[in-house]
Every structure is written in C-alpha cells, then in structure tokens.
C-alpha cells in the first residue's frame, strides 16, 4: 500500500518537475536575464508610472487616481486595489520565477489536473496539458503583453478540474456519505480557491468564458442524471455538491471584492457603460448600454478562417508574419527593388488575408488535437461528448461575432454583462480546453481497450478524412482556400501583391502538409495500438498502448512547440536596459519638467496621441491608451479634441515658422480648458507653448444650462469657456445656488485662484474672492469620490460637473485654502468584504483538508 502510494507521489511529482523544465525550456532566454519585449507592458509602464511612483514613496497613502492619462482617471484598471485580500500573497507565490515561465507552468499543472479529473492516464494527461498550454493564442498574448489574460487562462483549468473532481466524488458509486462528503467539500474548497485565483488575474472576459464552460458542464451533468432511473437516485448528492461549489465559489468571488466592486463602479462611467450621445449627433433617448456593437464585433473570426484551428497559416497566420527569405517570392521582389535589411523584413510581412482588421496569429489548437476531438465526437457516447460539444459550439458562434449576427445580438442584448466585452473572437479560447478534453478523453478510452478495432475503424476514418483528407486537398489545390488577397494589398504595387499571394499560397500548402503528416502519424499509432492480436497477453497490450501514448504526446509536443515558436521566440526577448530605454527622458521632457508651475498638461504630436501612453511616463497627458477610459472623455475626443488636434497639426505644417504660428494660433477651446500648456513636436525640439491655456482653475462670471447632453457638449465650441461655465441636465449644479455677478464690484478683477500643492490623489488651492464665486477646475470630474474641503473643515462645497468633463464649485468670499481629495468609498467597503471572504475561504479549505485526512485514516 505504502509502496503504491510512493510510486504515485513520485509519478506526479515527476510530472510537475517535467512541467517546470518545459516551461523554462520554452523560454530559456529568461534564465539569461532577458525579458519579453511586450508592447502592452510598455503601455502599462507609461500609464502606471505616476501611480506606482507615488505608491512606492507613500505606502500608507496609495493613490486610486492618476492624472497621467486622458486628463485624469481612476487607477482601478491600472494598478487596482489588493487591500484586504488574505490570499494575495499565496497567489504571488505561484508567480515566483522568471516570467513568463510561471504562466506556462501554472497552465501546464492546471491542465494536467484537468485531464486527471476526467480519468485520463497520467502520460496522456501530460500530452493534454501541453495541448492546452501551447495553443498559439497563449504565446501570442504573452508576446504582446496581455499578461492578465494569460494568467486568467492559466488558472481556468484549475477551476474546471476542481469542479469535475467535486461532482465525481459526490456521485461515486458505493461511497459512504462520510467519504463522498469529505471529498466533495475538499473539492469545492479547492474550486473556491481556483476561482479566487482565476478572478484575481483580473481579466473578467476570460472569467465569463469559464462561467460558460461551467454552465454547460453542470447542465449536461444534470440532464445525464435525470434521464436514467438508476442515476436519478444520486440527484440529492448532485444538489449537495452544487451547493458546496456555489457557496465556496462565492467565497472565492468575494475574496476579489476589492477588485470587482471598484471595477463595476468604474465601468459604469467608462466606454463599457455606454454614451449619452447618439452616433448621429441628434438629440434623443439613444444612450447605449455597453460597448457599441460594431466596435465590440470588429474582431470577429471569419467562418472561412476556422480551418486555421488545424492549419496555422490557413489565412496567412499573422499580419506581421515571417517567411523564409531564401524561398520567399516577396523577398525576391523586394530585392529587385533594392530593399535593404531583407532578413528583418522577412520576419514581419503582411501575410494575413482573413476578414479581421489585423491579427497577431491564428487560434491554432493543434492538428493532432483537432483530429482527436473529432474522433471523440464520433466515437464517444454519453455526457462528455454532448456537454463539450455544446460549449464548443457556443464558443464558435460567439467567436464569429458579426458573421452570425442573430446569435451575437441575442447575447449582446440579453445576456448579463456580455455587452461590456470587445474582441468577440476571444471566445474561441474555450476551444483550448474543450477540444483537448474530449480528444484526450477519447484517446485514453481507446488505449485502455474500451473500444475494439471494429468500433474504432469507422469513426477514425471519418475523422481522418475531415482532417488529413482536407489537408491533402489544400496541398494539391491550395486555391480552394480563396484568392490569397488581403484588403491591404490595394496599397501596394501589383508585382509585390502577386509575390505576397504566392508566399501566402506556399505557407498554406506547407502547413497543410505538416498537419496532414501529424494527423496520419497519430492515426497510425492509434490504429496500431488497437489492432493488437487477440493472442497478445495483457502486459504486451499495455506496453503497446503505452508506446502509442508516449509517441502521440511526442508528436503533439513537437508540433505545438514548433508552431508556438513562430509567436514567441528569441527575437521577442531583450535586456531590461533595452526595454527601459524607451522611457528615457528626452530633451523636450527635460525642458518641460523644468517648469515649476503645477497642474499643466501636455499633448505629444509625435506619437499616436490617443493610443500611446509613453508620454504619460513623464507628463500629465491629455492622451494615452486605455480601452476603458471614461466615456465622457471619449466623447470629448470624438467631438472636440480630435478636430482641434487636426486643426493644430495643419496650422503647424502651413505656418512655416514659429513666429507665423504664434501670430495666427488656432482656436483650441477644449485643449485650453484642459490646461494643455505644452505641445510636443518631437523628442529633440522645444515644445510649443499654448497661449490660450486657461490654467489650473479660474473664476467664471456666467453659467449656461443645457437642456440635453448633445447641447451641452456642443456649447463647448460656442462660448468663451474662460468666462462661462456649461452645465448639463445631470451635472448636479443648482442654478439657484450660483452667485450672480455684481457688475459694480470693483475688486472682482483682483479675485484669484491657483494650485499650491499637487499629488495624484490630493490637490491644494488657495484663492481670494471679493464675493461668492463660481470656480472651474481644470481637473476631470468623477462622480462622488472627489471631496472638497475649505480651511480644514470636514465638509465643503459640493463638486459639480462643468464644461462636459471638468469640476466646478461655488466658493465663499474671502481668502481660503481648498483641499480636494480622492477617496473611493468602494475601496474601503470592498476591502472589508475581501478580507472576510478570503478568511472564510482559507478556513474552509483547511477544515475540509482536515476532514478528508481524518475520514481517509478511519476508512483505512
């Protein structure tokens, strides 16, 4: 008994060590001190610099607001809130090591456990783990820096494994109530912890897809139980296990309340919450709830590119794909044109010719995995086939988005939270789990002798024809895939377009041949294992099955690693010094930072203003990059800032000299109300100073009340914002409370207001007013959580929204000091919920482990 236990321990410990070797072996550059040159992490470093610097210097007063992007915004989706969560340190411990190797390791172990929960042999479970982890999409998102998404995907199989383990323990035949209850409680506690970690990764869209998979499994299991009289006897256990999973799952969710509640509160005011403005600029009750449907479905997988689940270059692969420079028609053509650096050019060519705007690569699931999935679909009976097929079909229908609008619109308008998500093609990540789950479940049953060669033969031939047969057709007749033309080809010379099409054709044929060979080898190995003579003894049969299992895992691994290296390889790694060099202070940054004035902002015309956060590293920036910026600021960009910037650029280009520009400086009312003082043209040239910048705050003499949101934002162009404030119907302003200007007051021209101290979460001003005055602050308005006090009093004037997106308040006469501080109420409430939930989760996990230990000892 003990010997068998030790063998099991060594076997599974060996698998974990193997996964560690694989994780670091795939990215050996990290052992040499290199890091992945991730574009999204570059963006994060820029946007988070102000908040992170402040938090390091003020650990007891961490900021929940930054002014580094879009004039100012909460840090909810940048740095977040981890206060109160007792499991955060455990989560961080799993990430110990040289990233991204820990991401791969966590995914490998989780997928291994998932395969084991299905009853798959441990050798095949290793292959299944590799199939799940090394899907090309995972490597693409690591390369660009979608680390939160990768971590959410890495923890997803842990949650599924715990879920399946819990139900299987509860429904186990002949198990006494103490045994099944202790096992189910332990499984539910592990499920709660896995859900906790999966949500903690902070990618709610992936969590949403996890919920879809769980829903399909639970409904499938319930139907499977009730359709059979014998199985219906265990329905009570099903509900007991479901209650445990629900309770501990909620504890796992509650542990992340410190992130979820602020995120929910913030999302209502962002692009995910919708706009008050109509698309055509007309008045009316046309406020959208969530993202615009066209925007949300812009990245929709085409029906015609679904074969790249099995053939990576079916639609060209990547919008910046690589080719062999010695065999490429495109490179030969460019060589004739005298193009230099051809080896570098060959690494990044527009090879993709599918329906999406652009893409980093295909959702390649593996030719072997797709073949095994189809084999399982035709061979397996019972629940596993149907619930996995249901989850797969839902994922495909969601992933194709605008190409299946009835289904997409139903989800968009009826399913909770779905309208908050973009990039609908992401739903295909569900296939990263459902395809290997059914495929390796089927393979395991075949190699365990659950099916005879006769039972296997017809389903295997059908699966072979659909995969290897389809690949063979593409090798012989690649033109059946299409004309190899991309919408971007029209911008290129005809000769170059023809060369690109030939390269795309070649890439397709090569990958189709590769996939065909992989499938044929897999089919042969399975057929060989199933075709053992009847006279064979059990030992020889087991040996044959083991050889087939190991061989298939090796074939799959070689295929997944080879394709994976297209999207994450040595070229994507750099030294930390090289990565940080992109944030080096430029001469123009140094010139601007020498200005002692507080509160000014910049706009950098040398970058993509609203899609680049590098300038935010050094400055309070009116640009930046965020898919969850405040919706009112996005409205400001769409209706005013974009146009003003275009006008400014045209004027700069036509002026010729700085003197001519300043003599005929364009009107920039919205940029000026944002106190955009410096206009950056390039890193080495002096910035332009905006003579119209309105300063940190100013008193206004008049107020205009708009009847609608459309009128409110339209008035910003029509009035003098330095003397008049614009209030909308929901601005919170009290028209009767606004002081009337006294035309006889001779001291009004001496009234003054200015900033005296700046911190991202706390602003101080001093003002002198001869009478009660309405002041406008060049700071972005955010409902509720910014509070104002005067002269140290606990309460102060109410902050109103003015000029579409700025703050304003009525200030009493006299000489006074103002403090404006950002303290989100959701942070303190959510931190308390997180602490209570995480404490409960840890206690229940320990208690369930103890219960299982004592129950198992007594049973022995």
Language-model regions: role of each:
Residues 19-108, 130-142, 146-154, 286-365, ...:
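Membrane-interface coil-to-helix junctions
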């Amino acid at each position: 008994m003990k010997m068998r236990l030790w063998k099991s321990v060594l076997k599974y410990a060996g698998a974990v060590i193997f996964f560690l070797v694989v994780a670091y072996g795939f990215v050996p550059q990290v052992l040499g001190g290199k890091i992945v040159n991730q574009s999204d992490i570059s963006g994060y470093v820029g946007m988070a610099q102000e908040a992170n610097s402040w938090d390091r210097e003020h650990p007891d007063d961490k900021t929940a607001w930054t002014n580094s992007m879009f004039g100012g915004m909460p840090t909810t989706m940048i740095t977040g809130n981890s206060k109160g969560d007792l499991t955060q340190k455990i989560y961080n411990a799993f990430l110990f090591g040289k990233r991204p190797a820990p991401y791969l390791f966590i995914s490998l172990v989780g997928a291994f456990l998932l395969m084991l929960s299905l009853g798959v042999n441990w050798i095949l479970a290793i292959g299944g783990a590799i199939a799940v982890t090394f899907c090309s999409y995972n490597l693409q998102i690591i390369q660009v820096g979608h680390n939160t998404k990768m971590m959410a995907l890495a923890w997803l199989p842990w949650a599924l494994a715990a879920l399946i383990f819990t139900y299987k323990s509860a429904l186990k035949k002949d198990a006494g109530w103490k045994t099944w209850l202790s096992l189910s409680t332990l499984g539910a506690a592990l499920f709660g912890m896995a859900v906790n970690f999966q949500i903690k990764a902070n990618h709610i869209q992936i969590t949403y897809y996890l919920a879809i998979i769980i829903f399909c499994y639970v409904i499938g299991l319930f139907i499977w139980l009730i359709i059979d009289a014998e199985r219906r006897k265990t329905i009570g256990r099903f509900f007991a296990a479901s209650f445990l999973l629900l309770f501990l799952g909620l504890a796992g969710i509650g542990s992340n309340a410190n992130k979820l509640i602020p995120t929910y509160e913030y999302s209502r005011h962002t692009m995910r919450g919708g706009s008050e403005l109509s698309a055509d600029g007309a008045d009316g009750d046309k406020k959208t709830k969530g993202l615009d449907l066209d925007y949300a479905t812009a990245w929709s997988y085409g029906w015609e590119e679904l074969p790249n689940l099995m053939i990576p270059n079916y639609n060209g692969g990547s919008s910046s794909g690589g080719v062999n420079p010695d065999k490429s028609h495109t490179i030969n053509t460019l060589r004739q044109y005298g193009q230099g650096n051809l080896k570098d050019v060959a690494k990044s060519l527009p090879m993709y010719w599918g329906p999406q705007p652009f893409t980093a690569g295909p959702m390649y699931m593996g030719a072997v995995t797709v073949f095994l999935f189809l084999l399982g679909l035709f061979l397996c009976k019972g629940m596993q086939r149907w619930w996995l097929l249901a989850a797969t079909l839902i994922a495909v229908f969601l992933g194709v988005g605008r190409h299946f609008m009835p289904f997409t619109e139903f989800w968009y308008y009826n399913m909770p939270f779905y309208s908050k998500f973009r990039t609908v093609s992401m739903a295909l990540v569900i296939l990263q789990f459902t395809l290997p789950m059914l495929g390796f479940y089927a393979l395991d049953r075949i190699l365990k002798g659950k099916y005879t060669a006769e039972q296997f033969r017809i389903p295997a031939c059908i699966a072979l024809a659909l995969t290897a047969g389809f690949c063979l057709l593409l090798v012989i007749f690649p033109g059946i895939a299409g004309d190899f033309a991309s919408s971007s080809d029209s911008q290129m010379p005809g000769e170059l377009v023809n060369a690109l099409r030939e390269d795309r054709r070649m890439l397709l044929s090569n990958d189709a041949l590769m996939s065909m060979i992989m499938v044929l080898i897999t089919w042969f190995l399975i057929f060989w294992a199933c075709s053992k003579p009847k006279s064979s003894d059990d030992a020889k049969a087991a040996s044959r099955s083991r050889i087939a299992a190991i061989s298939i895992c090796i074939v799959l691994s070689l295929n997944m690693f080879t394709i994976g290296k297209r999207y994450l390889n040595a070229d994507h790694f750099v030294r930390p010094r090289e990565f940080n060099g992109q944030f080096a202070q430029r001469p123009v940054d140094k010139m601007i930072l020498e200005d002692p004035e507080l509160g000014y902002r910049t706009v950098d015309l040398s970058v993509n203003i609203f899609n680049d956060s590098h300038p935010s590293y050094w400055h309070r920036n009116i640009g930046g990059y965020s898919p969850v910026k405040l919706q009112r600021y996005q409205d400001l960009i769409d209706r005013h800032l974009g146009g003003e910037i275009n006008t400014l650029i045209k004027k700069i280009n036509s002026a010729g000299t700085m003197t001519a520009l300043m003599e005929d400086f364009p009107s920039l009312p919205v940029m000026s109300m944002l106190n955009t003082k410096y206009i950056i043209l390039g890193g080495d040239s002096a910035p332009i100073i905006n003579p119209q910048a309105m300063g940190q705050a100013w008193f206004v003499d008049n107020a205009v009340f708009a009847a609608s949101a459309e009128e409110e934002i339209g008035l910003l162009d029509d009035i003098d914002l330095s003397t008049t404030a614009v209030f909308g119907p929901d601005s919170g302003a009290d028209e009767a409370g606004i002081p009337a200007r006294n035309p006889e007051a001779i001291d009004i021209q001496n009234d003054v207001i200015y900033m005296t101290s700046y911190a991202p979460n706390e602003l101080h001003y001093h003002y002198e007013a001869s009478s009660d005055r309405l002041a406008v602050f060049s700071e972005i308005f955010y409902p509720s959580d910014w509070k104002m006090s005067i002269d140290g009093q606990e309460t102060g004037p109410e902050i109103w929204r003015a000029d579409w997106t700025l703050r304003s308040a009525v200030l009493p006469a006299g000489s006074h000091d103002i403090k404006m501080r950002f303290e989100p109420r959701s942070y303190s409430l959510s931190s308390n919920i997180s602490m209570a939930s995480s404490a409960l989760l840890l206690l229940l996990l320990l208690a369930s482990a103890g219960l299982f230990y004592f129950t198992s000892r007594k049973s022995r």
